[in-house]
Amino acid sequence: IKGAETAKDTASLTYSKTNVQVENVDEADIIKNDGKYIYTASSNSENKISIYKPDGKKAKLMSQIEYNNVDDDENEAFISDIYIYNNSLIAQSYSYDENSWEYTNIDIYSLADIKKPKKIYSFSQQGSYVSSRITNGKLLVVSNRYISSDLCKTDEDYLPKTKINSDEKSLSPKDICIVNDSNSESFLIISEIDILSKENTVVSKAIAGAGTNIYCNENNLYIANSIWDDKNQAHRLKDISPILKFNTEIYKIDITSGIKFTAKATVSGAVNNQFSMDEYAGDFRIATTASDEKSNDINKLYAVSYTHLR
């Protein structure tokens, strides 16, 4: 039957992909599928990446990457998630250096020989991994780097650091943004890696602040962080049953040409996750949850115009 053959042919060409929030913006996952091979990242005791080729009811193991992307065996890197892009495997991991600083790591492997993936590029930035996205041939990586006076022995230790193929350097002060009303004790580090260029050129910048969730489209990156509203501290100290009040800070970054911090806003309530945020018709929309005087949850929805972001 001709129709049945067409359906069969169509089915053979389909395969599952990562469920992403925004079209043309890829998100990392522990399992990826490119239609030919299945890639898995094991973050448990195995700590490795495996590549399989589906073969009927079975899957043939093609190769594995035993994961440890730091020179010192005592400071092992632990896999977070992966991407498959432009015939390359991009692995994201975290590790700690000899001074206990946490790093977010990016390793790019060529898949030209699927049986022998070859590492062609390594990049690290200080801080705990928040999230990442791929859009327009660029990998965006976000991390939180807390400022620890115990670990900072010199003035330069306070500056965020990045590392390309083991060559470490501090961010220039001109690449660090501090908002006027900021009293943050941490830095948000945002890096953009051109994964289509042979050099894998990277741009890194930082802003005084922190983040827990991100929303990204092809033009803008938003980073949200729910914080305790310390303006209510005196009220809470007098109240036997204090009501915890939270605000959410939103940082907007233009990613159309490099990384450009453009605005900051604050709304009432705490944001749940990335799916509580989006951009529509020129406005940034965010849903938060707050509490009233009786500790009842109140859901709030904000549409923030760009002109109001400061």
What do the PLM-derived regions correspond to, one by one?
Residues 76-81, 127-131, 210-213, 272-276:
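Repeated scaffold domains used in trafficking and secretory/extracellular systems
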Residues 307-308:
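Conserved small/polar residues in nucleotide/adenosyl-binding loops
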